[in-house]
């Protein structure tokens, strides 16, 4: 409920229409126009011309990366893909019929137990590092659980592949075609940010 003060009396408005929880410059969903904007860029332009890694940099830094910035970000993703062995044990302990979303939630929660910076939320660079780590590790968790529930070996990430390609590799055990890679990359871009979730405040 949102409480507003009118000239005559207090009133209680149902719903969230009058509630401002926070403001963001990261993305803007313009539903009436059918537009999604990331940091001033139309999602259609980004999906057509950018990579997922470039979009992550845009969302983290507010601008598209130059070559050096992009190379550094890619290296950071590759360096953070490995899962702690204890987390693999947690995934192996889950029943095979566990919902993949429940397995992912459990995996992400367990990651916090292995992260020495888990409680560091007052330092923007530490939060950014944790974000990069999660972006790199979430697909690995999903792929690992997918393969475990099919009695298949968990595959090692390929440092020569980008985030979208590596995910396909980890799931299938096959290097993706250019079309598969681009399709997954676009999916990643479209889901990179979608406004402010009511469930987060």
Where are the model-predicted features located?
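Hydrophobic alpha-helical bundle cores within soluble ligand-binding/oligomerization subdomains
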Residues: 2-201
């Amino acid at each position: 409920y949102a409480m507003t003060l009118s000239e005559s009396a207090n009133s209680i408005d149902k719903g969230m229409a009058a509630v401002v929880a926070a403001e963001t410059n990261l993305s803007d969903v313009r539903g009436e126009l059918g537009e999604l904007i990331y940091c001033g860029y139309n999602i259609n332009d980004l999906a057509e011309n950018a990579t997922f890694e470039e979009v992550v940099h845009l969302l983290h830094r507010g601008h598209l990366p130059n070559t050096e910035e992009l190379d550094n970000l890619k290296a950071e993703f590759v360096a953070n893909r490995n899962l702690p062995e204890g987390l693999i044990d947690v995934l192996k302990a889950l029943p095979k019929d566990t919902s993949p979303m429940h397995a992912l939630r459990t995996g992400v929660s367990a990651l916090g137990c292995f992260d020495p910076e888990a409680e560091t939320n007052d330092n923007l660079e530490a939060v950014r590092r944790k974000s990069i780590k999660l972006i790199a590790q979430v697909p690995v968790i999903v792929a690992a659980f997918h393969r475990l529930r099919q009695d298949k070996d968990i595959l090692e990430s390929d440092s020569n592949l980008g985030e979208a390609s590596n995910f396909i590799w980890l799931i299938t055990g096959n290097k993706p075609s250019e079309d598969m890679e681009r399709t997954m990359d676009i999916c990643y871009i479209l889901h990179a940010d979608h406004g402010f979730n009511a469930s987060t405040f």
